[in-house]
A protein has these predicted regions:
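Hydrophobic ligand-binding cavity/cleft-lining segments
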Residues: 2-62
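Conserved short-loop catalytic and cofactor-binding motifs
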Residues: 27, 65, 135
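Glycine-rich portal/gate segments that line the openings of hydrophobic small-molecule binding cavities
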Residues: 31, 48-103, 117, 153
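Generic signature of intrinsically disordered, low-complexity, basic-rich segments
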Residues: 2-3, 66-68, 112
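Generic recognition of short, well-ordered alpha-helical interface segments
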Residues: 34, 44, 76, 139-142
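Beta-strand/loop substructures that line and gate deep hydrophobic ligand-binding cavities in soluble
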Residues: 94-153
Length: 153
């Protein structure tokens, strides 16, 4: 990982997370009755994001260079996705309307041939209230439930 990219993803020189996180995180997951390849193929396509990630995007995304621009409940955001890979890694950086970058680890983990677990790591940002952290967790839970509904129909 280049130094610039590592810095964008919140990794310090020592390989540890920098001060953009409090060190508190929650793993929120959904089990989906579809292969990991199917889940990854759908979830990694930015054109589908507004269908299942209402907490992030409220309409179609527009590509601008290496990033995507979307309207979110908080205003206009930009999203930088991890390059396509065979490991199920869907990490992304959301740059908030304030300019604050937020790193979001997201994985599609195979569980046999027809099941997968989608795991989102929600990191508590400095200064985030208990109420806001709980609301973020609820939004992620709802987004993963929507992804499950779409892929299992």
């Amino acid at each position: 990982m280049s130094e610039e990219r590592a810095a964008r993803f919140g990794v310090g020189d020592d390989g540890l997370m920098d001060d953009r996180t409090t060190g508190e995180s929650r793993h929120i997951s959904a089990w989906i009755n579809r292969s990991a390849a199917d889940v990854y193929r759908y979830a990694s396509d930015p054109s589908h994001l507004h269908e299942w990630a209402a907490g992030l995007a409220q309409g179609q995304l527009t590509r601008v260079g290496e990033t995507w621009v979307a309207q979110s409940p908080l205003g206009e955001i930009t999203i930088e996705f991890t390059p396509a890979n065979d490991l199920g890694v869907l990490d992304h950086i959301v740059t908030m309307p304030s300019g604050e970058p937020v790193f979001n680890p997201l994985r599609v983990v195979p569980a046999g041939e027809q099941w997968s677990e989608v795991v989102f790591t929600l990191r508590r940002r400095p200064g985030m209230s208990d109420d806001d952290y709980t609301k973020d967790a609820a939004a992620v839970t709802a987004d993963l439930a929507a992804l499950k509904r779409i892929l299992e129909r």
